[in-house]
């Protein structure tokens, strides 16, 4: 039995994230997210839902210092990796340039 489809907004985030990955600048992973936040290059950080609390709070702290927006992804790191078009797990995604996507200005809920 398959799980029911997620809400439209979840699909909307996936589509915008996919477009940002294809046309913009981004980094994947915890270490590169922290590095981009410390350098002030990050504009949006997306954190997987099953990221450990300590890592999540550390990313949120650096994002607060960098005045960067943080979005908590509804799915886990497997789903976030799939949304990025990767075959591996991704705990955090940093968008530095959205490219053709309007992910930075859109309401991500």
From Swiss-Prot:
Tell me which domain of life the UniProt entry assigns to the organism this sequence originates from.
Answer: Eukaryota
Pfam families, alphabetized: Ribosomal_L7Ae (PF01248)
Listed GO cellular component terms?
A: cytosolic large ribosomal subunit
Q: Does the keyword Membrane apply?
A: no
InterPro entries given in the database record:
Ribosomal_eL30-like, Ribosomal_eL30-like_sf, Ribosomal_eL30_CS, Ribosomal_eL8/eL30/eS12/Gad45
One of the protein's GO biological processes: rRNA processing
Which key words are in the record?
Answer: Ribonucleoprotein, Ribosomal protein
> What PROSITE patterns does this protein map onto?
RIBOSOMAL_L30E_1, RIBOSOMAL_L30E_2
- Tell me the GO molecular function terms: pre-mRNA 5'-splice site binding; RNA binding; structural constituent of ribosome
Q: Which family does it belong to?
A: Belongs to the eukaryotic ribosomal protein eL30 family.
Q: Which PANTHER family match?
A: RIBOSOMAL PROTEIN L30
By its UniProt entry, which NCBIfam families does this protein fall under?
Answer: PRK01018.1
Protein name stated in the entry: Large ribosomal subunit protein eL30
Question: Which organism is the protein's source?
Answer: Yarrowia lipolytica (strain CLIB 122 / E 150) (Yeast)
């Amino acid at each position: 039995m398959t799980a029911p489809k997620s809400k439209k907004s979840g699909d909307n985030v996936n589509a915008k994230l996919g477009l940002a990955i294809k046309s913009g600048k981004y980094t994947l992973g915890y270490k590169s997210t922290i590095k981009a936040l410390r350098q002030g290059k990050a504009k949006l950080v997306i954190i997987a839902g099953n990221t450990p609390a300590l890592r999540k709070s550390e990313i949120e702290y650096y994002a607060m210092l960098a005045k960067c927006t943080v979005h908590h992804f509804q799915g886990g790191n497997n789903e976030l990796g799939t949304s990025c078009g990767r075959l591996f797990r991704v705990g955090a995604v940093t968008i530095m340039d959205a490219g053709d996507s309007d992910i930075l200005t859109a309401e991500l809920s």
